[in-house]
Curated annotation (Swiss-Prot):
Range of residues in the leader sequence: 1-24
Cysteine-cysteine disulfides: C27-C65, C37-C54, C55-C80, C67-C87
Tissue: Tapetum of anthers.
Gene label: A9
A Pfam cross-reference name: LTP_2
Top-level taxon in the UniProt lineage: Eukaryota
UniProt keyword list: Disulfide bond, Secreted, Signal
Family membership: Belongs to the A9/FIL1 family.
Protein name per the record: Tapetum-specific protein A9
Keyword Disulfide bond: yes
PANTHER family cross-referenced by the UniProt entry: BIFUNCTIONAL INHIBITOR_LIPID-TRANSFER PROTEIN_SEED STORAGE 2S ALBUMIN SUPERFAMILY PROTEIN-RELATED, PROTEIN YY1
Gene Ontology CC annotations of this record: exine; extracellular region; trans-Golgi network
Main location: secreted
Organism of derivation: Arabidopsis thaliana
Amino acid sequence: MVSLKSLAAILVAMFLATGPTVLAQQCRDELSNVQVCAPLLLPGAVNPAANSNCCAALQATNKDCLCNALRAATTLTSLCNLPSFDCGISA
């Protein structure tokens, strides 16, 4: 029979192993919800006004997920062996 300490150790190991996967899935879901804001970000949008769906999605999005996605986007050029570029945005 498995001791209580062994069971606790197994549960902790399972949590640690699945933590990044769960966080990645959570971020993926939250970031996909922010797609309702895409029309506000497209070139040519004249005086875009945020709608309630965009604002609600943005408010519900984990800020770390959003910031990490933006940081990751800036590395895409190097991952694709393309020249880097600067959009004039500082974070």
